[in-house]
Amino acid sequence: AKEAAAPTTLKGDQVLKDIFYEVKNKLETAIGV
């Protein structure tokens, strides 16, 4: 059923992932991991 989801939902998930990784990278850089 998830495969039949609207393209906008898929795009939204991708945007959230991009934001998540961007924030994660900034945090790791700030912490010095």
UniProtKB/Swiss-Prot annotation:
Superkingdom, natural source: Eukaryota
Protein name: ATP synthase 27 kDa subunit, mitochondrial
Pfam name, any one: Mt_ATP_synt
GO CC annotation, single: mitochondrial inner membrane
Keywords from the named record: CF(0), Hydrogen ion transport, Ion transport, Membrane, Mitochondrion, Mitochondrion inner membrane, Transport
Function: Mitochondrial membrane ATP synthase (F(1)F(0) ATP synthase or Complex V) produces ATP from ADP in the presence of a proton gradient across the membrane which is generated by electron transport complexes of the respiratory chain. F-type ATPases consist of two structural domains, F(1) - containing the extramembraneous catalytic core and F(0) - containing the membrane proton channel, linked together by a central stalk and a peripheral stalk. During catalysis, ATP synthesis in the catalytic domain of F(1) is coupled via a rotary mechanism of the central stalk subunits to proton translocation.
Subcellular location: Mitochondrion; Mitochondrion inner membrane
Gene Ontology biological process terms, A to Z: pollen development; proton transmembrane transport
Organism, scientific name: Solanum tuberosum (Potato)
InterPro entries: MGP1
